[in-house]
Amino acid sequence: MRNLKKTRRIQILLVAGGALVLSTALIGYGMRDGINFFRAPSQIVAEPPAAGEVFRLGGLVEAGTLVRGQGEEITFKVTDGGASVPVTFTGVLPDLFGEGKGMVGTGEMVEGTFVAREILAKHDENYMPKEVTEALKEQGVYRDPAQPEG
């Protein structure tokens, strides 16, 4: 009788463990398209992403690179001070988007150019996304907007 209880307990634990592993795998599989990792331009140059991989690119819009094409097509470069990545975007840019301003875009690399599906700009003069701030600090080009220049 005692041996039967022990066997039953082991069976229940194995089934529960298997169910936990299966549910975790299914949740991870279901969320794989919703997870977009952040990358700075220096990281992309050092370690190019896989073909078709959707990720977020962030940095500063490089001065002198913003070109408006036909229709709603825009090209520019994003930099973190260490490297620059060319970007194309077709659509309406946020009002606060501009050269020298922080941005984060979601998209993928196509033949060396980041093709953005969505562009987000910082929402006021002092805010910068945490990932962009960290990438700029790593490159040594971050300037605190709260501190006066000079």
From Swiss-Prot:
GO cellular component: plasma membrane
Subcellular location: Cell inner membrane
Membrane topology, as annotated: Single-pass type II membrane protein
GO biological process: one example: cytochrome complex assembly
Cysteine disulfide partners in this protein: none
Transmembrane region(s): 10-30
InterPro entries: CcmE, CcmE-like_sf, NA-bd_OB-fold
Alphabetized GO MF terms: heme binding; metal ion binding
Stretches assigned to the Cytoplasmic side: 1-9
The entry's keywords: Cell inner membrane, Cell membrane, Cytochrome c-type biogenesis, Heme, Iron, Membrane, Metal-binding, Signal-anchor, Transmembrane, Transmembrane helix
Topology, Periplasmic side: 31-150
Highest taxon of the lineage: Bacteria
Residues the entry annotates as binding heme: H123, Y127
A Pfam family hit: CcmE
Function statement: Heme chaperone required for the biogenesis of c-type cytochromes. Transiently binds heme delivered by CcmC and transfers the heme to apo-cytochromes in a process facilitated by CcmF and CcmH.
Family from the record: Belongs to the CcmE/CycJ family.
Protein name (record): Cytochrome c-type biogenesis protein CcmE
Native species: Rhodobacter capsulatus (strain ATCC BAA-309 / NBRC 16581 / SB1003)
